[in-house]
Amino acid sequence: MCRGFSFRHLLPLLLLQLSKLLVVTQGKTVVLGKEGGSAELPCESTSRRSASFAWKSSDQKTILGYKNKLLIKGSLELYSRFDSRKNAWERGSFPLIINKLRMEDSQTYVCELENKKEEVELWVFRVTFNPGTRLLQGQSLTLILDSNPKVSDPPIECKHKSSNIVKDSKAFSTHSLRIQDSGIWNCTVTLNQKKHSFDMKLSVLGFASTSITAYKSEGESAEFSFPLNLGEESLQGELRWKAEKAPSSQSWITFSLKNQKVSVQKSTSNPKFQLSETLPLTLQIPQVSLQFAGSGNLTLTLDRGILYQEVNLVVMKVTQPDSNTLTCEVMGPTSPKMRLILKQENQEARVSRQEKVIQVQAPEAGVWQCLLSEGEEVKMDSKIQVLSKGLNQTMFLAVVLGSAFSFLVFTGLCILFCVRCRHQQRQAARMSQIKRLLSEKKTCQCSHRMQKSHNLI
């Protein structure tokens, strides 16, 4: 009886002691981390106070711990990247911090705390950008997600401020990148309802627009500016041009860019170009004419690829070949929706057609205007002064020159007449003076003779 009684009373005590020795294993917590980044593995105390703890690897090697007011650390060679947040211990939090994550860090870590075991599963993933995060306009970017073989294709989603959202599992590609796609992309990897976000900085190098068009009247200067975000890139450039009436394209100018300085290598003399020596690339034609109207391609060759920019030049010319005809002509690439309009200034359109050449017969004298418009937008306009009927430009020029010549002849005759009159006046004055002197001399001689005769008597 005594021995039975003793056993019945000792059994609860033995179970109580055994419960203190047993370590309770709980469910695993999953933590995601990106290669090269940091990860924080949680371990919380229910008492919310400082306590002894130990972090161990899956093979039971001690990484670090705290016991009897002493900090315990494992092999420095193996765990130099591992640490904890000591200022959180007083609050009952004992996290394991792993810096500069490696793919081989993916494993199960065990936190022993208050006679309990907390298992934390760390999944480290690697993101590969092909061909990189600095690309040329029009190129494609492929993002590949590598993770632990045990993980089956975790989904990834990337967002950009341009409202681009790309979703896929393990890998995705973005095609025909634009300059607007440059900037910070926020990507999120999801696994077992756990999410890890990281930023991707993407730089897309290229032109601000895929094509530019200049609308100019004949005789005006045309300027083409090519804003680029190339940084310190070096390149070779060429502008090839095909005039509207030319059978084929030709090289207009070749140049190079090195250390932010532009150097012209070869250029045509007709038209004559002016190229800026610094960025942004600026190309100027001092005087355009109908023969230059057309389109071309600016090609920039860089180490990482080739960039293209379409360039268009539309030229307008308004002429009055004779007194009975007014002509407006446009050459260069225009939209089928564009319309040519001829009208007198501040009046209704006389002619309005979707053609490149329009005419007005017997135009009234005054200021005439030719406009090239697309819808409500006027792309360009040019003005001309129309002379009265029967007085064309040649006649007007002849009249002006004749009048000028007549004026010069009249002025010359007036000057000659004035000089002659002056000469005559001077000659008359001189003759008058001579007569006066002669008169005075005769008077003196007569007086002398009379005095001499008187003396003889």
UniProtKB/Swiss-Prot annotation:
It holds the Pfam family C2-set. Residues 1-27 form the signal peptide. Residues 28-127 form the Ig-like V-type domain. Keywords: Adaptive immunity, Cell membrane, Disulfide bond, Glycoprotein, Immunity, Immunoglobulin domain, Lipoprotein, Membrane, Palmitate, Phosphoprotein, Repeat, Signal, Transmembrane, Transmembrane helix. Its main location: membrane. Forms disulfide-linked homodimers at the cell surface. Interacts with LCK. Interacts with PTK2/FAK1. Binds to P4HB/PDI. Interacts with IL16; this interaction induces a CD4-dependent signaling in lymphocytes. Interacts (via Ig-like V-type domain) with MHCII alpha chain (via alpha-2 domain) and beta chain (via beta-2 domain); this interaction increases the affinity of TCR for peptide-MHCII. CD4 oligomerization via Ig-like C2-type 2 and 3 domains appears to be required for stable binding to MHCII and adhesion between T cells and APCs. This is T-cell surface glycoprotein CD4. It comes from Rattus norvegicus.
